[in-house]
Amino acid sequence: DPFDDPTHGQQQLTFFHGYYRQYQYLPRAITCAENDLVLSLCLLYGSAHPALGADEDLEYVVRRLREAWPEVEIHLRGDSGFGVPAMYDISEQLEIDYTLGMGMNARLKKYSDSLLETALARFEGTGVPQRLFTAFWYRAESWPAQRWVVIKCEANAQGTNRRAVVTNRPGAFVLPGAAYDAYADRGESENRNKELKGGLQADRLSDHRYFANLFRLYLHTAGYNLLV
C-alpha cells in the first residue's frame, strides 16, 4: 500500500498529485499480514503511479523469503492501484497466490447488472442488507490470457455498491465470497500505514535532498518494526 506524504518546501522529486490535490512524496510499503512488519519500502516521486516498480519490489521480497523458507506460501493482496498487468505477470511467474483489486468497467458492469438488481430487490423486499457474489473467467485487452474475476454486489440503506478483484486463489473458484473477504482484510495494512505515518511520524520528510528523505523514511520504518 502507498500513503501520501504532503510536502511544503522545495524537496527534490515532489510533485503535485491530482488525486490527493497536494504536492507530496508517495511512500509505498509491502507489509506482512502475519506479523505487521514492513518487508519492503520505497519512496516514489509525488505524482508516480502507486504500482511503479512494485513488481520488482515483490520479486525481491519473494526471493529473499524463499531463500530463508523455501516452502513458504505467499499470498499477495493489493488494491486496484496494483491491479496492473505487470503485477499479474510477476505473481504468476513467481507462482504465488494473488488477489488484486480491479476497477469496474462497462463489461464488468454488464456482467454483474442482474446480480446487482437481485441484491437491490431483496433489500427493498426485506430491509436486510444484501451482499451477493459472482465470478467468471475474464480477459482484458492487455492480458495474454483469461483470469478469474470475483465481483461483489451490495445493497443496503446507503445504496448499492460493486467491487471487483482478480485472483488465482484456488478457493476462489468454489467460494468467491470467501476469496473476496480474504482480500478485504487487507484494510489492516492501511492501518499499519496510518500508524507508520501518524504514530512514527514517517511523513517528516522535510530535507531538500531526496536521498536524505529516503534515509529518514528507513529510520522511521526501522523504529516501527522494532515496536510491532
Language-model segments: residues:
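Short, conserved catalytic/metal-binding motifs centered on acidic residues
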Residues: 1-4, 36, 74-83, 98, ...
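Active-site-proximal, Lys/Arg-enriched surface segment
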Residues: 2-29
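Active-site beta-loop-alpha junctions enriched in small/polar residues
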Residues: 2-5, 44-46, 81-83, 103-105
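Gly-rich Lys/Arg/Thr-decorated short loops/hinges at beta-loop-alpha junctions or inter-strand turns
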Residues: 34-46
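Active-site beta-loop-alpha junctions of metal-dependent nucleic acid enzymes
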Residues: 43-67
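Short, surface-exposed basic-aromatic patches at helix termini and helix-loop junctions that form
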Residues: 88-97
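An anionic, glycine-rich sequence signature occurring as long contiguous blocks
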Residues: 97-198
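Short amphipathic alpha-helical "interface-anchor" segments enriched in bulky aromatics
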Residues: 176-215, 219, 223-228
